């Protein structure tokens, strides 16, 4: 085959779309759509209409460029079957491997704490408002919920993974159905409150600060970084030997782009539908109550006077149940990653990396006790979930998703061709702005 024919074949292949590409597009999309999405409308709608319109413009670039940067880092390793830890070790040595292990663990573990608080608050809200039952002791509720999840994890891990995979699409479908079903309840409150003469760019409630804080929740909600390494390995094994690495990179970018479009469309439609049904004041109230937006919607419809429609009655009960299922799904998914990361840290620093010195059962037990114990402490303390996301969850995700790839592009010879690009500045800015939230929360 001539060079011209080879290039033509490669271009034709890029335009073709395989079943595996669709599978991975939906897989990336499904990974990102979880419990974090239930808090995005609260932060996005907190400042009113103009900030959420700005976030709408930023949503796709944040989702696409940041995940593409991480995918390029994963693609830069010499071994097509090597994961991100191996690739970082290749570029930066064993120290880099330790750093990435820490980053992965501390990027996921705080999410479990967030979900621990969320599931406790969601259950207690459902118990008191929808079931009209007397208030329960918070510590006992958190402990029982965590023990229930620990029991399921310990005795039914394989079943849990299978059930999680089945729950992804019903949850996404429920978000779309709820978004559409809320349309008859839309009102103009958020538009009526727009007064151009009162709009401030700066200040605590200004547009810039609101959007800045909104970037953190976007990084948190539009995040499928945990699966990017596996995705890249799969695509390299499928395409690289036949078409080369450059083609594989373009194919990965194409898949990430389509997954990002799907994700942004579903999440932003859900956020706008919630905002037009409620109001910025309602969103502030939801933040103060420390509950996800579905729980607040359930309480909102429960407090409606007069004869309720069938949908209002269904949503009153269904929204909290959907939220509970979503949080359970997200907790289980992130627990597996946290367990793997903590097991690796204990093995590396407690047993010098010697797997023969400790059984997997003992390792899993030690990790479970720490994970569930720390989650219970945080759930009992009940810190504000959005503050926890903005000060801890999102900054650590940003360091892995945004700053690590940018540092690698600057230092690694195999990534030199990506230097000096405008999208690198954008990804770096998103990472730094997200991390600077820590300073804002402190002062």
From Swiss-Prot:
Keywords assigned: Amino-acid transport, Cell inner membrane, Cell membrane, Membrane, Symport, Transmembrane, Transmembrane helix, Transport
Q: Which domain of life is it from?
A: Bacteria
Question: Which reaction is the catalytic activity of this chain?
Answer: L-threonine(in) + H(+)(in) = L-threonine(out) + H(+)(out); L-serine(in) + H(+)(in) = L-serine(out) + H(+)(out)
* Topology class, membrane: Multi-pass membrane protein
In its keyword annotation, does this UniProt entry include Metal-binding?
A: no
MF term (GO), any = L-serine transmembrane transporter activity
User: Lineage of this protein's species?
Assistant: Bacteria, Pseudomonadati, Pseudomonadota, Gammaproteobacteria, Enterobacterales
Q: What is this protein called?
A: Threonine/serine transporter TdcC
Known role: Involved in the import of threonine and serine into the cell, with the concomitant import of a proton (symport system).
Q: Which residues cross the membrane?
A: 22-42, 44-64, 97-117, 140-160, 163-183, 207-227, 259-279, 319-339, 366-386, 389-409, 423-443
Subcellular localization, as worded in the UniProt entry: Cell inner membrane
Single GO cellular component annotation? plasma membrane
Which protein family is it in? Belongs to the amino acid/polyamine transporter 2 family. SdaC/TdcC subfamily.
């Amino acid at each position: 085959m001539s060079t011209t024919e080879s290039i033509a074949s490669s271009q034709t292949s890029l335009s073709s779309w395989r079943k595996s590409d669709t599978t991975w597009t939906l897989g990336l999309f499904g990974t990102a759509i979880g419990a974090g999405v239930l808090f995005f409308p609260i932060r996005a709608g907190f400042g009113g209409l103009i900030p959420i319109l700005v976030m709408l413009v930023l949503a796709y670039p944040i989702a696409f460029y940041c995940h593409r940067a991480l995918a390029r880092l994963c693609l830069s390793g010499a071994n097509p079957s090597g994961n991100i830890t191996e690739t970082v070790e290749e570029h930066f040595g064993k120290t880099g491997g330790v750093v990435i292990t820490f980053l992965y663990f501390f990027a996921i573990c705080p999410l479990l704490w967030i979900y621990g608080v969320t599931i406790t608050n969601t259950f207690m809200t459902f118990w008191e408002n929808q079931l009209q039952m007397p208030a329960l002791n918070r510590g006992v509720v958190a402990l029982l919920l965590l023990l229930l999840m620990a029991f399921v994890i310990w005795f039914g891990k394989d079943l849990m993974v299978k059930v999680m995979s089945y729950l992804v699409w019903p949850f996404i479908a429920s978000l779309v159905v709820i978004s559409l079903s809320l349309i008859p309840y839309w009102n103009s409150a958020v538009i009526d409150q727009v007064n151009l003469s009162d709009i401030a760019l700066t200040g605590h409630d200004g547009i810039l600060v609101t959007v800045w804080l909104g970037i953190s929740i976007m990084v948190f909600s539009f995040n499928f970084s945990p699966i990017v390494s596996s995705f890249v390995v799969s695509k390299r094994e499928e395409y690289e030997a036949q078409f080369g690495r450059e083609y594989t990179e373009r194919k990965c970018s194409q898949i990430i782009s389509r997954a990002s479009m799907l994700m942004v469309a579903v999440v932003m439609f859900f956020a706008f539908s919630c905002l037009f049904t409620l109001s910025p004041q309602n969103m502030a109230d939801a933040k103060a109550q420390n509950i996800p937006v579905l729980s607040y919607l359930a309480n909102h419809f429960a407090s409606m006077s007069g004869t309720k429609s069938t949908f209002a009655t269904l949503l009153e009960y269904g929204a909290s149940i959907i939220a509970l299922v979503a949080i359970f799904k997200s907790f289980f998914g992130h627990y597996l990653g946290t367990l793997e990361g903590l097991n690796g840290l204990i093995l590396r620093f407690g047993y010098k990396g010697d797997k023969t010195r400790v059984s997997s059962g003992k390792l899993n037990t030690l990790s479970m006790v720490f994970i569930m114990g720390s989650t219970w402490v945080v759930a009992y303390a009940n810190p504000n979930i959005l503050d926890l996301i903005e000060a801890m969850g999102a900054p650590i995700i940003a360091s892995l998703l945004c700053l690590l790839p940018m540092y690698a592009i600057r230092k690694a010879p195999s990534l030199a061709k990506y230097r000096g690009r405008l999208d690198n500045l954008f990804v770096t800015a998103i990472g730094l702005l997200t991390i600077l939230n820590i300073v804002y929360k402190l002062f």
